[in-house]
Amino acid sequence: MLIELDYHGHHIEVYAAGLQGAWDAVVRIRRSPSGDQVHFDRVPFGEPTADLAEQQALIWAKRWVEDTERSK
């Protein structure tokens, strides 16, 4: 599990989920500190290891936060 406590005011949690020999990741993003906005997603990567899936998912989550901020 990877946790980013404060990325542009968001709390990000990422953990790997294995499926048929490949690893995807589950991402939970919530706005800090209120936590009133929560985004939950399973991101299909098909990575060979859990670590790689988590690292890729953290990058994906940070881009999601940045894109969400830009669209405001």
Mark where each language-model region is:
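N-terminal segment of the canonical double-stranded RNA-binding domain
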Residues: 1-33
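A short, charged, amphipathic alpha-helix used as a generic interaction element across diverse proteins
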Residues: 48-66
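A short, exposed loop/beta-hairpin motif centered on an aromatic-Gly-Thr core
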Residues: 37-52
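Residue-identity detector for glutamine
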Residues: 20, 37, 55-56
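Intrinsically disordered, low-complexity regions
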Residues: 2-6, 38, 60, 64-72
